[in-house]
């Protein structure tokens, strides 16, 4: 039996239409976590990646058959590679070599060309991305310095948080910072609803750049890399640090105790939120993020 065009247009969707509207999971009486691993590729980065590419199409910067390029620790690259496969673009990803094998495998699975630079060398990855984009006329997604990254969370993630906490006192947002898009986008929107809300940034103890320290190698992939571009430190109430081993331990305990298996940055977020609640006894609620799924870190745990 043939499927009619009417059925195709009313009953079927491209997978990218399923980005966002992720559920909220209760971690404790005070802490809720937005389950971003339910986005199509399993991470929060589907939100800004789609927003950036949609805008590029609308403004005439991108068309089918073009090439996009990005520097990434993995998740944003995976989102761009997936969207490129869905929409008919070629995709080049520049990535430090010490990222997980699972992330690299996913990028290649979606058809992206992976270009590796030295361990932890995000500045090198960004510089190479910019050079290749300019020399070849490719679309530079530019996640680390792109205001659309912030806008995607302002219009999407933060709106969903407001809907969930309607009628309740939301006091803190605790989140790791990679580009800083989630932190700044949520701050911009949530300020209007909760004028007293405070943002707690979380970074790896081994790379405490926001705390005034030196960058270093760490295992909390997706955090501690590039936040200097988008984060306005005047809007950050506190910076907390979590070690890689503590974050991994929290991931494993969460899986064994609740059946929720998330990535290492999510373990860091939960642990930081728990420590904040224990030390500060907030009156209101705390929201954090389960940024991605745990399967892409099996080789790292």
Each PLM stretch: what is its role?
Residues 1-301:
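PLP-dependent amino-acid enzyme catalytic core
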């Amino acid at each position: 039996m043939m499927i009619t065009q009417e059925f195709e247009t009313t009953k079927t969707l491209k997978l990218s239409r399923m980005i966002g509207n992720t559920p909220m999971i209760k971690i404790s009486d005070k802490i809720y976590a937005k389950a971003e691993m339910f986005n199509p590729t399993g991470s929060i980065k589907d939100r800004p990646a789609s927003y950036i590419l949609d805008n590029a199409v609308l403004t005439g910067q991108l068309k089918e058959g073009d090439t996009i390029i990005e520097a990434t620790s993995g998740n944003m690259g995976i989102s761009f590679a997936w969207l490129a496969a869905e929409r008919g673009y070629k995709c080049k990803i520049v990535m430090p070599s010490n990222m997980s094998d699972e992330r690299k495998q996913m990028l290649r699975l979606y058809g992206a060309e992976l270009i590796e630079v030295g361990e932890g060398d995000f500045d090198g990855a960004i510089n190479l991305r910019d050079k290749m984009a300019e020399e070849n006329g490719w679309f530079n997604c530019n996640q680390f310095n792109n205001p659309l990254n912030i806008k995607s969370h302002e219009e999407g993630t933060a709106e969903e948080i407001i809907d969930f906490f309607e009628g309740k006192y939301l006091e803190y947002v605790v989140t790791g910072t990679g580009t800083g898009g989630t932190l700044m986008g949520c701050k911009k929107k949530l300020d209007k609803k909760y004028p007293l809300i405070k943002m707690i940034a979380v970074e790896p103890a081994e790379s405490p750049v926001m705390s005034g320290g030196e960058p270093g190698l760490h295992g909390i992939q997706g955090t501690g890399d590039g936040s200097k571009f988008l984060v306005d430190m005047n809007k950050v109430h506190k910076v907390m640090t979590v070690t890689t081993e503590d974050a991994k331990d929290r991931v494993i305990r969460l899986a064994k105790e609740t059946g929720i298996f998330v990535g290492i940055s999510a373990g860091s977020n939960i642990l930081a939120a728990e420590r904040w609640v224990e030390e500060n006894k907030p009156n209101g609620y705390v929201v954090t993020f389960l940024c991605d799924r745990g399967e892409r870190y099996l080789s790292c745990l």
